[in-house]
């Protein structure tokens, strides 16, 4: 199974790269593990370097359970401000802060079995955050989705478990993240 996912990942990256001429420069950036305050500086440096070097596209390979909302918001702003087309490639998961980062990219591609969502804000002790914080995060996700012509409703539902999107339930009626 690992081999199949690895080959599929390489196929997707190869396909995206092939869309551009052979001489075009493609940046492949890994975002994995916990989203922390060191990551925005790295992403900003990579995006600036890609712009300086005339890259045609930046592919962000995402595999994270999330992390700090402030760091993810900074990364989102950097990606939205990029002059280069951006792609989120979700190899396994883009949970919570990872979902926000993915939504900031121009396009999202996922491997079979990958997941995105589960972005309900929580406090440092792991409990559900206040309605004020949830409202902020819901709007942050929604406006980010809208910026790239993605569904505001689906992005909002990733944050607010009270929201119901009928056509995104499994055959058994379970919520799909």
What do the predicted segments below correspond to?
Residues 5-21:
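Sec-dependent N-terminal signal peptides
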Residues 22-177:
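Soluble extramembrane regions of membrane proteins in the secretory/endomembrane system
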């Amino acid at each position: 199974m690992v081999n199949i996912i690895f080959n599929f990942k390489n196929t997707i990256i190869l396909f995206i790269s092939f869309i551009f001429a052979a001489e075009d420069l493609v940046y492949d950036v890994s975002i994995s593990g916990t989203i922390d305050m060191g990551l925005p500086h790295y992403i900003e440096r990579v995006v600036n370097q890609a712009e300086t070097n005339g890259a045609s596209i930046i592919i962000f390979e995402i595999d994270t359970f999330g992390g700090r909302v402030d760091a993810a918001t900074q990364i989102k702003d950097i990606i939205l401000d990029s002059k280069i087309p951006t792609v989120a490639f979700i190899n396994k998961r883009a949970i919570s802060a990872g979902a926000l980062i993915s939504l900031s990219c121009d396009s999202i591609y996922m491997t079979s079995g990958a997941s995105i969502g589960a972005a309900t804000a929580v406090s440092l002790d792991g409990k559900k955050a206040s309605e004020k914080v949830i409202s902020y995060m819901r709007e942050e996700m929604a406006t980010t989705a809208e910026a790239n012509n993605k569904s505001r409703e689906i992005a909002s539902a990733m944050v607010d478990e009270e929201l119901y999107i009928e056509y995104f339930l499994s055959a058994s009626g379970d919520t799909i993240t």
